[in-house]
Amino acid sequence: MDSESKEEQQCTASSAVMSSLETQFLSVPHQLESASLSWSIRKSLHSSTVLMDDCHFGFPTRSLRAGFHALPPLPEPQTLRLRPASLRTQEISHLLARVFRNLYTAQVIGDDLSDSLIKARGSEDARHEEFLDQLQQARAIYKQRLDEAAMLERHIMQARARDIAETEHTTKQSRLQVVETPVKLPPVKTAFRWCLDSKLMRKHHLISTEDYYTDPVPFCPAPKDKSTLGCSKLTFSCEQRFLRKSELDREAEEHCRQLTECDDFEYTVDSLGSISKAKERTTDSVKKTSRPKNKKWMEHLQVPQRALDRRLLASMENRNHFLKNPRFFPPNTPHGGKSLIVPLSKPERRASLNAEPEWSCTDAPVFLAKPSVGFFTDYEIGPVYEMVIALQNTTSTSRFLRVLPPSSPYFALGLGMFPGKGGIVAPGMTCQYIVQFIPDCLGDFDDFILVETQSPHTLVIPLQARRPPPVLTLSPVLDCGHCLIGGVKITKFICKNVGFSVGKFCIMPQKSWPPPSFRAVATTGFVEQPPFGVMPSVFELAPGYAILLEVLFLPTGLGQAEETFIIVCDNCQIKEVVVVGTGQLVALDLIHISGGKNEPDPGELKDLTAQYFIRFEPENVQSTPKKQLIIRNAT
């Protein structure tokens, strides 16, 4: 039975292989039937024949179908890491990833997997628990190493920062000692050795400063003293040169001293001889010229050498008499050329013919601005206004110029448009600049533009923005009159704009000025500051138009009330308005009573709070007597 079952298994395996071969042959397109078999088909044929042979001899212990399904898929290779762009970097991870590939780049147990394994521990398997303990210890050691590396990196960075600060302080102190600061001083001694902890570096097997410093460390640092810098000390060759020069100077001084002594001796002998001869022959002494008293200049310089030195001095002096560049001098000056708009002043006739013309450097400008003042008017918030300013060269030489833009953010200067290349303006030609004005309110703005040339004088072009302000015909004091306490009185005032521009106005209490935001203060319709209220609080008036301002007076106390309101215009101008009102109580005067005033009889009952007493005469029943009272309002 066993042999029959084995034969049946071999037959089923061979039939399965043949069926797979048939499917592979059928899957080949019709156009490739005449060609040879593909490499995959031949490989499958070879593997199938080997499997059939193996199955024939009975080597496999599992079924063929189970063997095919048990093969695991090959893992995808890990991607290589990029090579660092810098050649000085010490990172070699890309080399390790290229050599070891999956062993280096593939993550066997990541952080997420290890965290989940440690959190879910509690298995009955002892080997699994031991593995988790070792994994937790490895993670703790790994975290400790990372913390130590971060601590070392932080310590090195702090030491480097302290070293840089100490170096800068030492360099600054050395610059104070040098009279003439050179372009770049030599570096000072570094203090990095004293800022780094050598024991900590050795503990973690790192290179410390003591490994490359051979001099012994002093027990305590030496006191700092003012010492001459190495850059200010003389070198060996310079010292030798100065020593040789000092010796030559000493020899020259000794030689001059000897010549002076000889000259003095000869002068005394000659003077005595000349005095004796003068007494004998007075007429001959007048004709003969006396010898020079100081012969030192004759001993040092010969006549040919003296002439050569004079020619050398004359040639050196002639080098300074060159033609000056007229661009560096104002016009109508000795070296500045002529002005095209300001003529030279002629000398007076009475003066000599050699009189020089009067030069003036203040009346002759180099560039003339057209227009001379940048003026903007009738502007609004939002648009950008432009103006072209032309600068004309008024001299007889071509000149360069530099225009400095305005300093305020409301004016901007565009690029210059020159008549030629290179930014040079020929005589009589003009260059143009566009000035932009960007207002953020309707107020007044002032700024200026500076035009600099190679001459020392600077041209100032003012920039102004003016808008005719609106003018309101509103009295500075608004009197609401008298009102009873607890009542309401409305007073109307006419407000007219007699200016030349449209204005938007906002009324607010004085305590709210200046506001953080006009949107928060400007209420629609009504603004209140007890006991007064003004409406409307926001309005707009065109030139020649008027509006009625209603002032509400609600007195709560007796006497005069006064409050101040601020009227703010959109051109940043304000106007203070004082609102005045008087609160009163009810006051009545009894002027006349028909029949006259009566007095109560003694003992007769009456109202003690009453001021007047009115008595009616006895009348019949159902009759109606009348008395007329005249009452006047005394408020």
UniProtKB/Swiss-Prot annotation:
Keyword annotations of the record: Cytoplasm, Differentiation, Spermatogenesis, Tumor suppressor
Subunit and partners: Interacts with alpha-and beta-tubulin. Interacts with BBS2, BBS4, BBS5, MKKS, TCP1, CCT2, CCT3, CCT4, CCT5 and CCT7.
Main localization category: cytoplasm
Gene of this entry: Dlec1
One example of a Gene Ontology biological process annotation: cell differentiation
Localization, UniProt: Cytoplasm
Any single Gene Ontology cellular-component annotation: cytoplasm
Known tissue expression: Expressed in germ cells of the testis (at protein level). Also expressed in the lung and kidney.
Name of this chain's protein: Deleted in lung and esophageal cancer protein 1 homolog
